[in-house]
Amino acid sequence: MKIVHFQMKRMIVVAWALCGAMAVNAQIQMNAGVQYLQCMQKDMSTDFYDLSNTYFLADSLVSFDTAKGEGLVQWKRYRLSPRQAFNLNGYWPVRMQMLDFPDAAYENDPALKIKIEWITPRTARIRMLTTPVVPKQSDADDVMFCEAFKARKGQSPSASQAPRESRDAVTYSSPYGSIEIQKYPWRIVVKDAKGRILTQTRHLIDNDSTQVKLLPFSFIKRGSDNSRSVNPVLLLSPGERIYGCGESFTSLNKVGQKVHLSVTDPQGPETDGMYKPVPFYFSNRGYGIFMHTSAPVTCDFGASYIGAQRLFMADEQMDFFIFFGEPKDILNEYTNITGKSPMLPLWSFGTWMSRITYFSQEEGLEIARQLRKNKIPSDVIHFDTGWFGVDWQCDYEFAKERFKDPVGMLKQLSKDGFHTCLWQLPYFTPKNRFFPEIIEKGLHVVNATGGMPVEDAILDFSNPETVNWYQSKIEGLMKQGVSTIKCDFGEAAPYNGFYHSGKGGLYEHNLYPLRYNKALWEVVEKNHPGEGIIWARSAWAGSQRYALHWGGDAATNNIGLLGDLRGGLSFGLSGFSFWSHDMGGFVTASPEDIYRRWLPFGFLSSHTRAHGAPPTEPWLISESFTDAFRDCAEMKYKLMPYVYAQAKDCSERGLPMVRALLVEFPHDKGAWLVEDEYMFGSQILVAPLMESGNIRDVYLPKGKWIDYQTGKVYEGGYQTIEAGKIPAIILVRDGSLIPHAPLAQRTDQINWNKIELKAYKADASKCTGLLFKPGDKNIKKIEQ
């Protein structure tokens, strides 16, 4: 009976997802004739040039109920008509009369719902449908939203004035800005509190002044399967700059770029692919947008037309949160919806030592001994792919012949002050001993017949039974004494798969990292209350609740260093407080020079890990390198009170520890241009040496800056500065009070009763800072 019940359940799940997944094949596997490889990032813009599709252009607001905050937008039906002019072939949108039968059953120019509400005085939400069918999923069921947002009870009474309707528009206002819905031509106009237009949607009549017949705000109905996708198009103003979109390795300012928001394995931070795309961005004009969707999005920020943001969404509805304010305001508002990063345990801010890979108990214990022998402050030993019986073959068990007493090993490491992290992944090859069980129990993503869509069994984390099975395996390791788990991969959920959620891969592919992060983080937190932490590679909107993440497989060269720094800054501009990277790069043994210059960036990040192709251990490289490694580690451990307080502040406010200058100095135009320096917290500026040598040009925001190593004072503006003993430029903001601790070899030995407050003062009348000790409930503001 169990077998029959299981088979029936699987058939129901497959049938449930069938319609959606059929559309996925049409939309995703081949876009406008472009064949995509499995899990390749998708360019959704190609669908919006397909002559076989029907195009519906937002035209007018035909009705609106201000009491309900909803109305109807009429969409005019068009087709793309080929046009030849002096041997140049193109297309223009041309009005179309439908040939659908029976014609009385359908609308040529449908009127479809729009809904608007204020969430807070700084956040408005606008939803638009492309079909008469209202989606069934509620906010309470959405995994991208945090629990606090789900629990909210309607609009805050102080969030806005009542909407005002005039002959030409409906206007929603708050103290920070307004949303104006113009009736004809239909537009959404976003203004600041002074009435300045920040951005607005494009209407077809906006093409009247140009030969470029740019498609305005529209949606398509595909000729292949009648599926729909929406294309919001907004104004991009002269001088406008766009930031965010996740852990992007390209230039921080996305204007001029085409950004694909689909989770992929880019094979490193030197390409335009992303392990961690996030459908959120903000502008230097004072607004931000969260595209609430899990479907792929291609953001054309002025790449094809310099005056437009073209958001090519695979989703059939638009659900946008629009934020008002400066970067800190916007990040706080966004993370109030999708969640803030939790405060992480003190030990996690220490040094993590790893390589690919330690293969035995003795090897792990020897690494711990060498760290203590060489007096390198450290807190974590990580075992990567080699702790199983067969390398890379995850079965949640230590290899018996190489790990004679894993529990004893974990106890010894703990006694010596080390926490232990283990690698794993959610894919099971046919040779894995769990493969038959996963298939038999239906714990994997399936295809249209209930079989395998790809070579491996990929755990389906939308299935509660899969989550329970997976967490039981991890829990066994936790009970042995493991502290945390590396949450590797997660980018390969098949687009053509069928998921227990009832959704196809179009909507589940990007959600996969979020579900994976959540399942792992929750079991770690359950077994180590208050110390929930993972080490994850992939992410989506909301994954910041399940910290932390690292930058992936960087090349061991200057470009790998640049890509990681850009990625970390962009990730921080997307709502993630904590982030790390592999010091020296990952792919091959790191040359000593690049590894040495990478060290300060690693130790002045929220989390610090040496990992990659061996050797990563400093004593195996050279004596001088060991000294340099030790110097950087000692610097961070002495700065641990500053690190810990800044981390707490970031977790409460949705701010990044590795912080682009524009976040801290939004009124400094030069700060918006910098992408090879960063603020470590709010008071320390770090400029890594991006090339060989010991000197570099640095941009400093207005004011005085004190060299952390020499005490020399610099004025704001461009300066050429020589690095000190630590191979990086490290400067402290004038008026900073930085708490330091006596040197300790492990975080649990830090003497918090002997904190030294160091004042960095040039012109400032006083020095201020933050202090937060283990056991404290609130951050203390300190002053001297």
Feature annotation, model-predicted:
Residues 121, 129-131, 175-177, 184-186, ...:
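An acidic- and aromatic-residue-enriched active-site/binding cleft used to recognize and process polar
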Residues 354-356, 364, 370-373, 383, ...:
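C-terminal substrate/ligand-recognition segments
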